[in-house]
Amino acid sequence: MGVLKFKHIFFGSAVELSGVFQIVFIFLLIPCCLTANFRAPPVIPNVPFLWAWNAPTEFCLGKSGEPLDMSLFSLFGSPRKNKTGQGITIFYVDRLGYYPYIDPHTGAIVHGRIPQLGPLQQHLTKLRQEILYYMPKDNVGLAVIDWEEWLPTWLRNWKPKDIYRIKSIELVKSQHPQYNHSYATEKAKRDFEKAGKDFMEETLKLGRLLRPNHLWGYYLFPDCYNHHYDKPNLYKGSCFDIEKKRNDDLSWLWKESTALFPSVYLTSRARSATALSKLYVVRNRVHEAIRVSKIPDDKSPLPNFVYTRLVFTDQIFQFLSHHDLVYTIGEIVALGASGIVVWGSQSLARSMKSCLHLDNYMKTILNPYLINVTLAAKMCNQVLCQEQGVCTRKNWNPNDYLHLNPGNFAIQLGSNGTYKVDGKPTLTDLEQFSKNFQCSCYTNLNCKERTDMNNVRTVNVCAVENVCIDTNVGPQAVTYAPKEKKDVAHILSNTTSINSSTTMSLPFPRKHVSGCLLVLCMYSQYLNICYRLVAIGIQHGYYLK
């Protein structure tokens, strides 16, 4: 970390701050200098966090012969090719225009093989027809383009995608045999990236033109390629600077997108990895997506809908545990994403037995947890933001979650298949929200964060109809004894004990720090507080090394 110099005109000398003292000093004195941390407004009114279901389970029946309980989900869409007019439409390579690629299994050339040889104008003509077919009405929904065969950034096409680099270089050499390999490679890179950009950019433009009420974006964008579960002692899941730079270079893509669809799928390596390893990977990937969402306009960020699965990608019959849900869904909610898309393959509904397993998992594990985080997030939004923004971690790296206090709440599944929430929040619960979370205002709203929780008298939030917390705020904690040990609250009681060893990052650009300090200490009526804090730092030897 570089030197932070603060020269106070009244002190007549320069003081250098560092380490813990610098962080404490900044957090105490410069909240007014921070740029407002905005989030995209809800896609659906009164649904601050969107749950979406993107799995082919429409024919599944549960134990009682009834369809799966999807009451917590606001948008639905089956990936099956014959499904149209859905809340979520996912476009694979075989159902959206003439996407050029090489079949990874057979090596067959499809629509020109590489983007430079792809029929762009024919693609757009076909694209128009298929958009109108799959989206007969322009209702509010998600339009997700899943093109994974090649990436628009040349250097990200590593094995086995390096075939696109190889074929691009071969094309240039066939057209210009006089070029040496180095020059041919450089030209191939330029040609490939331009053609890839044209295909992806023009596809988004036409989609937005024809169906403007849908939110358009590409699955897996952005990504930061932090997949190293097997090195928890060496690797903290951070996104490498080079990958952040490459994401920055895709500004044209973020400009044309109206939503981002990153992914936090876990493999079985994550199952055997430490809790922190899984947590780091998900946390950093979502944090990078939120950073990218602000590239087009930091005051009007793009919504982030994070794709997740209920199973491990390479063990499709093994559901995620309670703790895995905390490390995925819990992280996503606490970081302030716009929603989650649960994707699933046909294996979820391949037989009556698999449908029954899914039904049981949803009733006993998934849905109670979704209710828990939904109610906690809505409660925080209501008391902290007056519902004009969403609660996000004050610093993105600590292990603070939007969970109901397990000592005060219990979520019960009744014999009739409906859920009931027992308990009430206390002043201490609300103060914990205020301590660990901040209010990120919705775009174009100048919301004010409540700081005194003593003024909150009641809380009225619902996860779904008749699954609500509608009560007054209790003055002190009263331990609630759940009737059933399957209550989700007690399972969460240990999740906040995880200690993160990652370095805390300042939630604002360092270049603005010294200017903010100068302005505050010039105009603050508490100048001697500034002086005393600086003096304390000097006394205790907090100098930069």
From Swiss-Prot:
GO molecular function, one term: hyalurononglucosaminidase activity
Listed EC numbers: 3.2.1.35
UniProt record, GO biological process: carbohydrate metabolic process; cell adhesion; fusion of sperm to egg plasma membrane involved in single fertilization; hyaluronan catabolic process
Residues annotated as catalytic: 148
Keyword Acyltransferase recorded: no
Sites where a glycan is attached: 82, 180, 372
Keywords, alphabetical: Cell adhesion, Cell membrane, Disulfide bond, Glycoprotein, Glycosidase, GPI-anchor, Hydrolase, Lipoprotein, Membrane, Signal
Topology within the bilayer: Lipid-anchor; GPI-anchor
Localization annotation: Cell membrane
Record's function text: Involved in sperm-egg adhesion. Upon fertilization sperm must first penetrate a layer of cumulus cells that surrounds the egg before reaching the zona pellucida. The cumulus cells are embedded in a matrix containing hyaluronic acid which is formed prior to ovulation. This protein aids in penetrating the layer of cumulus cells by digesting hyaluronic acid.
Protein name according to UniProt: Hyaluronidase PH-20
